[in-house]
Every structure is written in structure tokens, then in C-alpha cells.
Amino acid sequence: LFNGLANHPDFNTVNWKNLKVAVGGGMAVQGAVAKLWLDKTGCPICEGYGLSETSPSASCNPVTATEFTGTIGLPLPGTSMKLIDDEGNEVTELGQPGEIAIKGPQVMAGYWQRPDETAKVMTADGYFKTGDVGVMDERGFFKIVDRKKDMILVSGFNVYPNEVEEVVANCPGVMECAAVGVLDDKSGEAVKLVIVKKDPDLTEAQVRDYCRHNLTGYKQPKTVEFRTELPKTPVGKILRRELRDKK
């Protein structure tokens, strides 16, 4: 949404001096988009986090922040968040990825008439397992790494689409992009990169050269595809599954 608005031809005709707060959520805000938004409006994006199961929100950055942090902020009052591993143990090492788990008054009681599905996502001590992988810094701020199910396993190495997209979004000539995992005979999975051009003259060779200089080898895309638009939900979240499923 922020990217689409900031790139709209009429965006610069608006006087943004009275814009006080811009709150981002729904999907991770890319640093390149946050910078573009700040440059054009003078108002930093304040990113928050929540899911349907934790409506409307579980964490947020301070609205008084003067710059984009790249984090989802701190848990809201009365809310507890932690990181857990695949066995349900708490991850306490700073910077170590784990699944974000949330406990608070906004967390659902369960899925309607689906006790089996509820049991899969609720821990014994009442935390909801979000399916999002995150890290926590020394201040207690959380940062989303990616959806657990979207992780790409390349020759045994974990590749998170968000980290690839964050880099490629800064490539000159790129409007927006998405990275997904596709089956590969040699590496098990490989990175597929789908790009919407800002510069119509952008070439695959330029994208690959940029990736070679900014991404480690196993994170570089095996396939680069250009499209006029990316499939999205009504609220603007990229539908990665449609990019994976399309042959």
C-alpha cells in the first residue's frame, strides 16, 4: 500500500505536512519503501504487528519514533510475547530466530468448532503460536524474519524470502518484488524472484548482477521473472503461494 501510494503519479501533488502518524501492518514494510515514504511525506512509518487470531494488534513501535526501525516494536500493555523453538522451548539468545508466540486479552479463545486446529496453535501455558519467525534485540523489540511456512531450504541452508526481497527492493529500476521457493533437482529448493519494474529498461542481467554483489550464493535467485503486477489480497499482502504454484 505504501509503495503503491508513494509511486502514484499524483502523490507529490498532495501537501503532507499535516500527516502525523503512518502505521504499517499486514505484511513487513521494506526499508526501501519506508525511506521513499519518509522522503516524500516527512512522516516515518510506524510498524505494528497482529493477526486475525490476535485482533487487532499485539505489538507496535512508539508513535513518537522519528525514523523507521524495521522492527514490529514492543508488546502492547497486558500482552506477552516470546520466541519458541520447534519443541516449544523458549529461545532466549538475542538475535536467535524462533517462532513468535503471543499471550494476552486479544488472543482468540480458539477456532470456532475446530478444537483440533486450536490445539495445534495453542501452547499448554496459553500462548498462541503465530507461524511467524522473528528475533528479539537487547531492548526487547521484536523483528519479523518471515513466515515459517515460506522459508526456502536451499541445499540445507535456510533462506527467508523477506531478506531477499529487502535487498532486491533496493535494486535500481525495481518497483516491487517477491521471492518464493521452487523445487530444484540439485538443491531441493531454489529461489524464484518475481519483479515488477519501475524502469521498463531493467534487464534480468542487471538484476542478477545486483544480486551477485549483495546476496550470498545460496540466496541468489535461480529464476528471475518479470510481471506487470504481483498477486495480492484485498489489503495488499502479496500472495506468495500463487507465485509458487504458477508453472
Q: Model-flagged regions — what are they?
A:
Residues A6-E67, S80, E87:
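Gly/Ser/Thr-rich phosphate-binding loop
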Residues C46-E53, G73-P75, V180-L183, E225:
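Beta-strand->loop->alpha-helix junctions that form or flank phosphate-binding loops
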Residues L1-F2, V29, V107:
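Alpha-helix capping/helix-boundary segments
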Residues H8, G104, A109-G110, E117-K120, ...:
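AMP-binding/adenylate-forming catalytic core of the ANL superfamily
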Residues V21-G24, A179, T223-F226:
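Hydrophobic/anchoring residues in structured secondary elements
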Residues G26, G50, G73, D132, ...:
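Active-site glycine-centered loops adjacent to acidic/histidine catalytic or metal-binding residues
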Residues W16-L19, L76-G78, V174, P221:
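Core-facing hydrophobic residues within beta-strands of well-ordered domains
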Residues L74-G78, N89-V121, V159:
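Conserved ATP/PPi-binding loop(s) of AMP-dependent carboxylate-activating enzymes
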